[in-house]
Amino acid sequence: AGFAGDDAPRAVFPSIVGRPRYTGVMVGMGQKDAYVGDEAQSKRGILTLKYPIEHGIVSNWDDMEKIWHHTFYNELRVAPEEHPLLLTEAPLNPKANREKMTEIMFETFNVPAMYVAIQAVLSLYASGRTTGIVLDSGDGVSHTVPIYEGYALPHAILRLDLAGRDLTDYLMKILTERGYSFTTAAEREIVRDLKEKLAYVSLVFEQELETSKNSKDVEKSYELPDGQIITIGAERFRCPEVLFQPSFIGMEAVGIHETTYNSIMKCDVDIRKDLYGNVVLSGGSTMFPGITDRMSKEISALAPNSMKIKVVAPPERKYSVWIGGSILASLSTFQQ
């Protein structure tokens, strides 16, 4: 969250609401009945954590309202009734969801005006393009969204219910095979951090797997909050491999490379060349080192032989949806 015209968000925190598992015994400590974001994160040991956004779509409106309240009053410290607002939504977001979001903003927070933009379109703006296909992969959902001259092509948008949270869960599972046990919501956050710091995408998975069996080059150590040090090896690239091979977690879906290709194939034959030449990665789950080359390689294998394929991974892609929103909301034409 932040202000239009800024080049980076002012506030970045996880969409979590935590409620105490125990009753407070010390009077006057000002214990709250709910904690949001980083505070919920830091007190996770005594809280039950809930995620009000599932697969990119709000599923718990009471908790979502708490998150918005926290954003306005604690993070940005603004009065919502004084500022027009730009919100974003997942592609193919149900209409009822958008209506509920609008209702809460106008009735609970009394915002003067608001606009809801599609996340992937904003990422494309942020990369300085108006035509391209965006693979947006965050925590709960991934989408491929072809955009031509600024218009998303809804018939060709594909959704994959596979993203960061699933990768974290899979990493928890394969770490268990190594003898490290992570189970609680609090421990999942530790594994998420481990994933963000150490995971990478291999160029040729089978080859990397063979190499890792015979050498220790892949191994890295990681210090847990209690000081214990764990070692992870092949798990580093086995984890994000799920994006390319969802069958690893028992999903029947095709990987992100094939989803991108299928999305392009649903578009008019005349615009495919422009899409192949502008594949834009966006979202936190595209931050793995090696993902750009791998996407390039995999899409080239599917596309016609002579096709020029360019996969673009802007360094700020973790926040490119926000940056695109900041650009859009600061245009004078938009404000009118």
From Swiss-Prot:
Gene3D superfamilies, sorted: 3.30.420.40, Actin, Chain A, domain 4
Keywords of the record: ATP-binding, Cytoplasm, Cytoskeleton, Hydrolase, Nucleotide-binding
Keyword Metal-binding: no
Top-level taxon in the UniProt lineage: Eukaryota
Matching SUPFAM superfamilies: Actin-like ATPase domain (SSF53067)
Cellular component annotations (GO), alphabetically ordered: actin cytoskeleton; cytoplasm
One GO MF term attached to the UniProt entry: hydrolase activity
EC annotation from Swiss-Prot or TrEMBL: 3.6.4.-
Subcellular compartments: Cytoplasm, Cytoskeleton
Catalytic activity: ATP + H2O = ADP + phosphate + H(+)
InterPro entries from the UniProt entry: Actin, Actin/actin-like_CS, Actin_CS, ATPase_NBD
Main location: cytoplasm
Entry's family note: Belongs to the actin family.
Other noteworthy facts: There are at least 7 different actin genes in tobacco.
Purpose: Actins are highly conserved proteins that are involved in various types of cell motility and are ubiquitously expressed in all eukaryotic cells. Essential component of cell cytoskeleton; plays an important role in cytoplasmic streaming, cell shape determination, cell division, organelle movement and extension growth.
Protein name (database record): Actin-53
Organism of origin: Nicotiana tabacum
Higher taxonomy: Eukaryota, Viridiplantae, Streptophyta, Embryophyta, Tracheophyta
